[in-house]
Amino acid sequence: MDVRFYPPPAQPAAAPDAPCLGPSPCLDPYYCNKFDGENMYMSMTEPSQDYVPASQSYPGPSLESEDFNIPPITPPSLPDHSLVHLNEVESGYHSLCHPMNHNGLLPFHPQNMDLPEITVSNMLGQDGTLLSNSISVMPDIRNPEGTQYSSHPQMAAMRPRGQPADIRQQPGMMPHGQLTTINQSQLSAQLGLNMGGSNVPHNSPSPPGSKSATPSPSSSVHEDEGDDTSKINGGEKRPASDMGKKPKTPKKKKKKDPNEPQKPVSAYALFFRDTQAAIKGQNPNATFGEVSKIVASMWDGLGEEQKQVYKKKTEAAKKEYLKQLAAYRASLVSKSYSEPVDVKTSQPPQLINSKPSVFHGPSQAHSALYLSSHYHQQPGMNPHLTAMHPSLPRNIAPKPNNQMPVTVSIANMAVSPPPPLQISPPLHQHLNMQQHQPLTMQQPLGNQLPMQVQSALHSPTMQQGFTLQPDYQTIINPTSTAAQVVTQAMEYVRSGCRNPPPQPVDWNNDYCSSGGMQRDKALYLT
């Protein structure tokens, strides 16, 4: 590495360099002898020493021209006000490289942050390499960032904020007295002198309080070590988790169908059946293993003709087994096709038979007749019933109709009619109520229906002929959505007529022809 010295310029520059902020001058680091003396250390000057005034500027080579042996670093994006600001002192040409302290340490004055002063050693060897022996003493606590930044004073000034706090954590663990602090009052006095004069502008794109997005080398080292330890601990815990797992239970064998034909046995099995009884009779205390050995020896000594007899029996049993197996599989296929059909055909009769059983009365004719007349007396009820229980049979499904006097007369012709004054007041009341309830759904349908039946049908014949059971209330689900009820309530669709009723409903006018009533005869529930 060559050392270059540059003479001072003839004329002073117009302005200081851009990175130097505020009235404080900036010490140009390119003119220092980087290997001044036998200790091969360089040092930053202390605040009590003289500095070059801000009006003096010297041209220097770019950083790329210097051949530094520096590990690759990624300087964080810190605001410019975090750089070291030096005090302005009297003008004059002095040596830019000042003598260092006796212990080879350079003082690092952190400006604009409440941290004690930190001194970091520049550990450059004679051959330009880093002295890693002092750093390898405590790799877990100290980091090599100090050596990376200390190869150049400006790089040391660009050290992240978190680094002084990291070094300050365990001062007792740092060897060779590499960590020293000053009094808090002295630090505050220095900070007051440097910061009290003027407001420092922020030229950095990041705000003053922003933190570096790039992790410092120290944090990355500690994170790598933490990851290694977590991997080791995780590796130790894995066998325990594997041991904690329960062994898989063997799958249960499917139960064999008793109708399935059994597979035929081999010729040796047939011979074993025949001879086993004889051997057991001779040796009752013989175990199964001993019996099998005796049978095997007898099978080996058996003649070929006798073996063929057993083999023929086995072949005949195989043919019979194949026939039985084909018939068994055909029966399984036929059952698989017939079972779903039986289920589908058996369901509709159950539904049809269960629905009419809800209605009870002394006469099916009367109950059916009153049911139809009650539906016509309360046309506002029809959208509710069709929406709540759409699966009712067609003869039970309500039919909207506005012809109230006709339907009442049909109901009254079957039995003795009650006085008209008893029916008409509740009838008009419910007609007015039903105009608003399909849209608002103020009451559940299960609560509306019994009240309407009791209030609309006051005559004893009505109460005898049609009695609403609690089972019917369960069929009508009161929790259906109001949207379905509203959409069906808005559609006043009748057979051959789509005219909606006028808002002041006049039941004597504005209704369709009475042709729709020709089908509204007595409905019998079957």
Curated annotation (Swiss-Prot):
Biased composition (Basic and acidic residues): 228-245
Superkingdom: Eukaryota
InterPro entries xrefs: HMG_box_dom, HMG_box_dom_sf, TOX_HMG-box_domain
Location(s) in or outside the cell: Nucleus
Compositional bias per record (Basic residues), positions renumbered to this chain: 246-256
Keywords: Chromatin regulator, DNA-binding, Neurogenesis, Nucleus, Transcription, Transcription regulation
Stretches for region Disordered: 138-178, 192-264
Residue ranges: DNA binding: 261-329
GO cellular component terms, A-Z: nucleus
Biased composition regions of type Polar residues, renumbered to the chain: 192-203
Induction (UniProt): Up-regulated during differentiation of NK cells from CD34-positive hematopoietic cells in the presence of IL15. Down-regulated in mature NK cells.
Name of the molecule in the record: Thymocyte selection-associated high mobility group box protein TOX
Species this chain originates from: Homo sapiens
Name of encoding gene: TOX
